[in-house]
């Protein structure tokens, strides 16, 4: 989903952009408020959640099961959406997008950390509402809040993940 580059893609209409952004915001709000029903309502039944590193989860039921298990290991979390865009898909009811996020969290064991990442998304309009058909998490940093762990978005690592990087 990282190629072609966004500059070569046609943006969705303003109305679709706003509705997709509402989907993104509803997702982040559900993470913050630990609301699995709300979080699950963001996905199509046959969606795919790609967490990178070969961790691919298929189907809404399996995605929800993993999310509940993951949230069980986190005592508190705030997910923030920073910026993003959405582009026309192969039909009027399909689109793709990219959204930068960060998470600040405290794990159940008391450790705290941050995640800096972006999602490459695919959406479908179902009964007039945009939903995720795929979310591919591209982690750029995951570790202590002091940023002492390694970043994973240097040029070589981006290229290895199939992301166009020319500087």
Task: Identify what each model region corresponds to.
Residues 10, 14, 54-57, 110:
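Charge-dense, low-complexity intrinsically disordered segments
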